[in-house]
Amino acid sequence: MKTIYLIGGTMGVGKTTVSQQLKKELPNSVFLDGDWCWDADPFQVTEETKAMVMRNICFLLNSFLHCTAYKNIIFCWVMHEQSIIDEIINSLDTGNARVIKISLMIDETNLRKRLSADIARGIRSNDVIDRSVARINMYQILDTIKVDTVNKNVYEIVSEILTL
């Protein structure tokens, strides 16, 4: 049986870092960052582009699920609404897969510190802080396993995920 990990969280919580390390820890694993399916300039949020990114994500995840080379599929994306998670899961062929839905959690103070450091390094723009902070509480109500990232390094977070 395969396992697919859906890892959500607000911008800057550490989804990509955790997912990359999880990929190294799990055998026969593959990783998809949802941002790779919608990397455009200018970034346009319309009904058409939202439908397109969902098709892109589900096509790739189903390709991984059907590929015999992979046992563990890791997907990360913001996924701040239950409807997004549900649409992805309902579009996947999970008959031979265990689905683990995770939300990486953080408090506002620590999120601001992480994002400010990213801004200082030129990785993110200034406007990300308010947008990301506004989404923190949205993850509390999702049907996901909550993994707290505060005062933990990536290895501790991954170790916790590996026990699920």
Task: Enumerate the language-model features and the residues they cover.
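P-loop (Walker A) phosphate-binding loop of NTP-binding proteins
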Residues: T10
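Walker A/P-loop
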Residues: T16
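Glycine-rich phosphate-binding loop used to anchor ATP phosphates in small-molecule kinases
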Residues: M52-N96
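Conserved substrate/cofactor phosphate-moiety recognition/catalytic segment
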Residues: S19-N62
